Design a protein with these regions (language model features):
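N-terminal secretory signal peptides that target proteins for export/translocation
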Residues: 1-8
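Extracytoplasmic metal-acquisition and chelation regions
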Residues: 29-310
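Bacterial N-terminal signal peptides
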Residues: 11-24
């Protein structure tokens, strides 16, 4: 009798395990396959899609924003994607178009419903009067680092919700519900960050790559110069000499760099005494920045602490 009961128990256990496994497989199969170019975009997509989406980011957050190293795994991911979310403004122009061509997925080609451009509706800063890559400028359509302004993050969330609903209209009410909740959370956090960032108002800084314009505009900081001559153009010796002289005259307390080499920041700091801070212009670069909200929070707190505000 005990053996019979034991065998029945194992059969029941096995049946339940199979059913649970099948349910998980079905759930995964039904999930919308989302590929984002950057971790911040991926996180916002997860907040909008919740359990309905399976989201992966191509970049990790520590790469040069305009030159993500291509990995073989990118192609099959793009080939299977239902939607692709990009920064836009040609941020990914140096590496993504070739990948899309090889991946050969018409659903996510530029201009198609599955291609979601996060920059739509963003108030673009530093937009040039004409489109020109002749001198290697990596911001030919304006500064693409808009996610450093959390108000722009709200616009991105709306774009992602609209893009998901465009491709999967049957789930539009769910996307809208999640969007509403996420925007409310962002509004609350933005109010907190603006209070927290009061010590940053009027603070001068130098950056390596021109990527902090949106953050500075939101929180009242003043950029006085960049190590790069133009976005993506490394400095000449004469440019460094002039920048060092400017720092000595204007005395900005901070030099911010991210994915770039520390060589020039350390060289400038040795000559001027300026404090060097490494902050990545996308979430995911540190464990504390694995969500969009955590990334902005970490960035605000780090800079406030750097100027002695906390």
């Amino acid at each position: 009798m005990n053996t019979l009961l034991h065998n029945k128990a194992w059969r029941v256990f096995f049946l339940v395990a199979v059913l649970v496994g099948l349910r998980s497989d079905l759930l995964f199969a039904q999930q919308i396959r989302v590929i984002a170019t950057w971790p911040a975009l991926a996180d916002i997509a997860r907040q909008i899609g919740k359990d309905m989406v399976n989201v992966e980011s191509l970049a990790t957050g520590v790469e040069n924003a305009h030159g993500v190293p291509i990995r073989p795994s990118f192609v099959p991911k793009l080939n299977r994607a239902d939607v692709l979310i990009v920064i836009g403004l040609d941020n990914e122009a140096s590496w993504l178009p070739a990948l899309l061509e090889v991946a050969s997925n018409p659903r996510i080609a530029p201009g198609q419903p599955g291609y979601i451009d996060g920059s739509i509706g963003v108030s673009v800063l530093e937009a040039p009067t004409r489109f020109d890559r002749a001198e290697g400028d990596l911001h030919p359509k304006g500064n693409s680092h808009y996610l450093l302004d959390p108000v722009s993050g709200k616009i991105v969330a709306q774009n992602i919700a609209a893009g998901l609903a465009r491709n999967f209209p049957q789930y539009q009410p769910t996307f809208q519900k999640n969007l509403t909740a996420y925007l409310a959370e962002l509004d609350s956090r933005i109010a907190q960050w603006e209070k927290m960032a009061v010590p940053l108002r009027g603070v001068k800084f130098v950056e390596y790559h021109p990527e902090w314009a949106y953050f500075a505009n939101r929180f009242g900081m003043k950029r006085i110069g960049s190590i790069e001559i133009k976005p993506g153009i490394e400095p000449t010796p004469n440019h460094i000499v002039n920048l060092v002289q400017q720092i000595k005259q204007e005395k900005p307390p901070l030099l911010i760099y991210g994915a770039q080499s520390p060589r020039f920041p350390e060289q400038i700091a040795a000559q001027t005494g300026i404090k060097v801070i490494r902050l990545y212009s996308s979430g995911g670069g540190r464990p504390e920045t694995d969500s969009y909200i955590k990334w902005i929070d970490y960035t605000v707190r780090t800079l406030v602490q750097a100027v002695g505000g906390v």
